[in-house]
Amino acid sequence: SSSAVYPEYGVQPFPEDSERAVNKFWGKYGTDKIEAENALLERVPDAYILRPPYLYGSMDNVYREAFVFDCAMADRKFYLPEVGEMKLQFFHVEDLCRLMEVIITKCPTDHILNVGNEKSISIRDWVIKCYACFDKVPEFVSVPETVEQRNYFSFYNYEYCLDVTRQKKIYPETMSMDAGLQEAANWYIEHEGEVNKKPYWEYIDTNLV
C-alpha cells in the first residue's frame, strides 16, 4: 500500500491505526490505495499490508534521487526549497524485500505495518549524500516558498513521518542512507534510460537562474 492513505492533517508520526482519508497532496492515488486495502481485507482477512514512505534504490523509475544524481554528474548548482530543512522519510527497496521475507517466514502478529527508516533526513542533507555518491559537494541556491516546489524539485512541500514501531519488532535494522544511495547511484549509471525523467532543469534554467 502506501503512506498516502493518511490525511495530511493527522497527528504525526502516523501510527497504523490512524484515520485513513483523502490527502490533499496525494489525492486519488491515496484514496485508490485505501480502496485497495479494503478490497484485499474483504477477500483475504488475514492479509499483510505494508505502508511505505518514499521508496528508493535499484529499479526506482521515479525521478527523485536520480534527479539529484544528474545534477551532481553535470556539476550543476542545486536549487533547494528555502534552506532545505524539510525532512523526508525513505525506505530502500532491498529492505522492503527483506522485510517481506521475514513476514513470510515468521508470520508476525501485526498484519498492518508502516515500513521505513526510523529516522528522516532533511532535504539538504539528502542532497549532500546524493552528490557524495559521485565525490561531489553541492553548491546550493535557495528558492523561496512562493515558487511552486514541484516545478523544480522531486517532492511536494509536505513533511510527514510514519511510526515504524511495529516494523522494528521484526526488522530492527535498515540500510544506511549512505549505502542505500550509493547502491542506487551505481544502478542508475547503468539504467538511466529506465527512469521517467521530468523537465526540472528546463524550469530552473528558464525561471530561476
What is each stretch, according to the model?
Residues N157-V209:
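C-terminal amphipathic/interface module of NAD(P)-dependent oxidoreductases
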Residues L50-F67:
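Flexible, glycine-rich beta-alpha linker
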Residues V62-V68, P81-I104, H111:
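Substrate-positioning beta->alpha
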Residues F69-P81, D135-V141, E145:
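A short C-terminal helix-loop "cap" of Rossmann-like NAD(P)-dependent dehydrogenase/epimerase domains
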Residues N23-L50, R64:
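Active-site Tyr-X1-5-Lys
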